[in-house]
């Protein structure tokens, strides 16, 4: 089934070229199907890239999905045009009365700041509190996961001695959990972050279960016992070239950065990187949409 997106969204052409089934709202409204309503709080600086990456994964589900893009009203991004934001995004006061079947809170390049110093932290906490009553299941990604663990459970983040940067092996810690249904015992996922959460802090919280770990990247996937809050410290949505672009960006800025681990063939940045995480990324999103959103959400919200 398709993903429903605004008619002129730039991601539409890219997704169609990749044979991802998309349709605009006009065609979707003509189908007598109850679609899932997913809201994406996009905190990434390059919003159009993040849109395409997330829509690509949502579009591989057999379910019909309506997507709403949300941005903080208290933050003015520097790398996305005002026209794009006005055309395709809404702000929290305009949707706080609505119910959504699922929500995605993306990462953001603010992880080295204390949470309370992020200029939209107050608004973000208001949104995360709202999800308790208005969203069936929320998927938090990278810094979004750290922010959610801190807000909901008081779990802090810790600075790393060097950036966790590369594509790492992960193991399934809990068998027969629906979110990881169909996963291999070992799977790969990109990470790109300067901070971490600790296993021992999470294990102190009875409502949380660690579903996946990495020897090198640490905690990867955490879920609340009711499945309403999912925390993912990696970036399964990343394109094959995203880490390459981040590496070249940091080199150009003169920042201390090492070659992304287990990413370039033979650790040679002149070689094109291979996407070795795509199948599990798609499976993760399909499982979340099916078992944690579609199977749990009411047909009609009260």
From Swiss-Prot:
Residue numbers marked as site, Important for acyl-CoA specificity: 111
Record: active site: 142, 235, 237
Key word Acyltransferase present: yes
Site (Important for substrate specificity): 192
InterPro entries registered for this protein in UniProt: Class_I_gatase-like, HST_MetA, MetA_family
Binding site for substrate: 163, 192, 249
A GO cellular-component term linked to this record: cytoplasm
Keywords assigned by UniProt, alphabetized: Acyltransferase, Amino-acid biosynthesis, Cytoplasm, Methionine biosynthesis, Transferase
Organism superkingdom: Bacteria
Pathway as given in its UniProt record: Amino-acid biosynthesis; L-methionine biosynthesis via de novo pathway; O-acetyl-L-homoserine from L-homoserine: step 1/1
EC number: 2.3.1.31
CDD domains, alphabetized: GATase1_HTS
GO process annotations (BP): L-methionine biosynthetic process from homoserine via O-succinyl-L-homoserine and cystathionine
GO molecular function: homoserine O-acetyltransferase activity; homoserine O-succinyltransferase activity
Catalytic activity: L-homoserine + acetyl-CoA = O-acetyl-L-homoserine + CoA
Subcellular location: Cytoplasm
Known function: Transfers an acetyl group from acetyl-CoA to L-homoserine, forming acetyl-L-homoserine.
Family from the record: Belongs to the MetA family.
Name the record gives this protein: Homoserine O-acetyltransferase
Organism of this sequence: Geobacillus kaustophilus (strain HTA426)
Gene for this chain: metAA
